[in-house]
Amino acid sequence: MKNNNRPIFPFTAIVGQEEMKLALLLNIVDPKIGGVMIMGDRGTGKSTTIRALADLLPEIDIVANDPFNSHPTDIELMSDNVRQLKENGEEISLIQKKVPMIDLPLGATEDRVCGTIDIEKALTEGVKAFEPGLLAQANRGILYVDEVNLLDDHLVDILLDSAASGWNTVEREGISIRHPARFVLVGSGNPEEGELRPQLLDRFGMHAEIRTVKDPTLRVQIVEERSEFDRSPEDFLQEYKLQQEVLRQRIINAQQQLNNVQLNYEIKVKISQVCSELDVDGLRGDIVTNRAAKALAAFEGRDEVTVDDVLRIITLCLRHRLRKDPLEEIDSGQKVEKVFQRIFSNL
């Protein structure tokens, strides 16, 4: 766990990498988008950006002394113990805490991730003795897996299952325990170290590609800002305090606005037409694109999705779902844009 006293580089001070920042923000507005896979060169600020986002987010109300960060009113985000207390009409004390940001280490075992059941205690004392894992700690927060392409496929499957369902189930020797595990899954990796299997890649809601900044003036700006932050973190954070507060409020407003956003039928049909023409397997691409477009409209403070909203997110939602053709020279992102322009040209 990170030390909360250590200053964290502010999200609004991060230069460039707009694609990654947008994908992360939209997943915070609507966690049901299904997470982000960030592929790119080493040293491009992936970890810095994710930590900065977690630090930016408003504090959340959680039930005190609860290992699952249970929500005080939402049953979907509440552990069985807390639900039992509520049903019995008992008083529940609350505390406020930062949105959890959990790092999943590469060598983590399944027990460390999912939690363990003390079988001996369960059999002798008749109680379900459960030791929560990282998924419990990540409930209502962000779970970050660096170099996810080097993680065991079975573990990636478990993470994706929990992220999609919002629950983690642990079964040992006929004893079963279930707890809420609703989190934004963020994976990052370097394409040189190997790709994820297509069926795993497809289950990430969005896929952002980032490159090392080439523009010399931007590079100088990034280096100078980092030096300034390292020299005097307090002054640097003060400088960005207002911008951080404005963005934090935008996120809160977008989360509240999300359910009111409309996506008209014609645009939905066009989105599905793009997916169909690109030969995207299944319907996950259609669903995620619809969700992301609504999240973007809410983030921009609108209650209706525009064609421009779809243009900004469709590549992020579809590029990783295209079948790889080794003979094709066009990049998958450009392919998505090309088909989008043709199908949406008459709207």
From Swiss-Prot:
Any GO BP: chlorophyll biosynthetic process
Keyword Transmembrane helix: no
Gene3D superfamilies: Magnesium chelatase subunit I, C-Terminal domain, P-loop containing nucleotide triphosphate hydrolases
GO cellular component: a single term: cyanelle
Catalytic activity: protoporphyrin IX + Mg(2+) + ATP + H2O = Mg-protoporphyrin IX + ADP + phosphate + 3 H(+)
Keywords: ATP-binding, Chlorophyll biosynthesis, Cyanelle, Ligase, Nucleotide-binding, Photosynthesis, Plastid
Location of this chain's protein in the cell: Plastid, Cyanelle
Biochemical pathway: Porphyrin-containing compound metabolism; chlorophyll biosynthesis
Task of the protein: Involved in chlorophyll biosynthesis; introduces a magnesium ion into protoporphyrin IX to yield Mg-protoporphyrin IX.
Family, similarity comment: Belongs to the Mg-chelatase subunits D/I family.
Protein's name according to its UniProt entry: Magnesium-chelatase subunit ChlI
Lineage: Eukaryota, Glaucocystophyceae, Cyanophoraceae, Cyanophora
